[in-house]
């Protein structure tokens, strides 16, 4: 366990939706953590006019000057993200990609995946519906 006088834990956050943004906000405002970057989905077309719209996590990160990165399930991009952010902790919530083992095992304090249902019984993108 870290002493409170130590530097904050360098944290990489992976997420997309509003719910994950709530946890990102809590971590961002907790002095024990420093969000070094976020990985989220690319902007997606939304609505009848198909307007490119950022994820809620990207919106939060942009508003708070946190670097945003996209991997698109590309193994090399996951390797680049580890070099770029050098996380001590990875927190993943509502992120629609299967993460490579090397990525999950990299951080000093490992990785945390929060899922809003019992796995594997209620797996998938909308497990609580």
Predicted features and spans:
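One-carbon transfer enzymes
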Residues: 1-129
């Amino acid at each position: 366990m870290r002493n409170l006088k130590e530097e904050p834990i360098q944290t990489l956050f992976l997420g997309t939706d509003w719910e994950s943004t709530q946890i990102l906000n809590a971590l961002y405002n907790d002095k024990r953590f420093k969000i070094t970057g976020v990985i989220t989905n690319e902007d997606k077309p939304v609505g009848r006019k198909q307007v490119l719209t950022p994820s809620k996590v990207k919106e939060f990160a942009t508003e708070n000057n946190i670097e945003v990165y996209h991997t698109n399930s590309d193994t090399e991009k996951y390797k680049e993200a580890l070099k770029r952010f050098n996380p001590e902790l990875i927190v993943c919530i509502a992120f629609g990609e299967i993460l490579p083992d090397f990525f999950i095992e990299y951080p000093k304090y490992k990785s945390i995946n929060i899922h809003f249902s019992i796995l594997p019984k209620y797996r998938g993108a909308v497990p609580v519906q």
